[in-house]
Amino acid sequence: MNESLKRTPLYELHLKLGARMVPFGGWEMPVQYSSVIEEHRAVREAAGLFDVSHMGEFEVRGPQALDLIQLVSTNDAAKLAVGRVQYALMCYENGTVVDDILIYRLDEHRYWLVVNAGNTQKDWEWINTARERAGLHNLELIDRSAEIALLALQGPKAEEILQPLATGVVLSQLEPFSLAKNVTVSGVPTLVLSRTGYTGEDGFEIYVKAEDVAALWEALLEAGDEQGLLPCGLGARDTLRFEAKLPLYGHEISDQHNPLEAGLGFAVKLKKGVDFIGRDALARIKEQGPTRKLVGIEMIDRGVPRQGYPVAVGGEVVGEVTTGSFSPTLEKNIALAYVPVAHSAVGTEVEVIIRGRALKARVVETPFYRSPHRR
């Protein structure tokens, strides 16, 4: 494996568990331990534990912290109460996507921005440039990515596995997109514990100091063993998020896509009362209406759609697949794809070009999967 790839503090433990390691966003990460399908089903039916320490964390604090976040975020962080978490996007002036992020409001003037691993350096430079241009000096911006590790415990049994180990929080009272501080898990002090995730299931994300994560990982795996908890890799993380229609940077969103065509308009607040980068372009797109739309596709003919495969209507290529795979939950071959709005209605028949063959498919409702366990 390339020596320049970064490793999380759990690298040796992944190898001990038999993980297959792959490069991802500049990191050497576990793609699977047993099998993607087995790990995927564990999360849907019981629970899975993910090492997502490759994600980036920026702390913004000080009197102008909110001003900076409002400038770079499409969402309205002024409506974010202390102890809550908000999904948002950062956009370029033309409305395309720099990254999608989570904003954590830890205190009155203290926030975290959690960014995608492969975008950490780009995002850091982009936010710093925005700050300089706006002359926002009454704040501190700190890259804490190297000192923070992150585990995601996901699935319907996540709460019952975690609660006996946790002191300082009653998990049944922690709402989705809420956070708790001063929580200890199996003797490990956490920095932040939130009811968030990227699987479409109920679950928690646990932020700890990098030096504490190995003890937490082992304690959680041991505690959840009887309930069917499995360590899970990036393969299952991708199929889980994809079934729930959660976007992945470089697939559904990128500097070639805007949030409105991606179906993320709920996180774009054009009337939040302050200007933000990309606002004018997004206002124009909203007024005119997007020309294309992200849709779900289900294969009728046999074949597995993959990213980049063309989508055609009546033999003419009109769009392309952003993510495609066999769905372990639905046991069908499905895809997300961008197509012109005229061909985006549910039930529309399309073809996916797989290895030169036009295979029949249809546009279906999304998300492909909604958890019966989510709160």
Curated annotation (Swiss-Prot):
Keywords: Aminotransferase, Transferase. The keyword Transferase applies. GO terms for biological process: glycine decarboxylation via glycine cleavage system. Gene3D superfamilies: Aminomethyltransferase beta-barrel domains, Aminomethyltransferase fragment, Probable tRNA modification gtpase trme, domain 1. The glycine cleavage system catalyzes the degradation of glycine. The glycine cleavage system is composed of four proteins: P, T, L and H. It comes from Symbiobacterium thermophilum (strain DSM 24528 / JCM 14929 / IAM 14863 / T). This is Aminomethyltransferase. Belongs to the GcvT family. It catalyses: N(6)-[(R)-S(8)-aminomethyldihydrolipoyl]-L-lysyl-[protein] + (6S)-5,6,7,8-tetrahydrofolate = N(6)-[(R)-dihydrolipoyl]-L-lysyl-[protein] + (6R)-5,10-methylene-5,6,7,8-tetrahydrofolate + NH4(+). It is an enzyme of class 2 (transferase). One of its GO terms (cellular component) is cytosol.
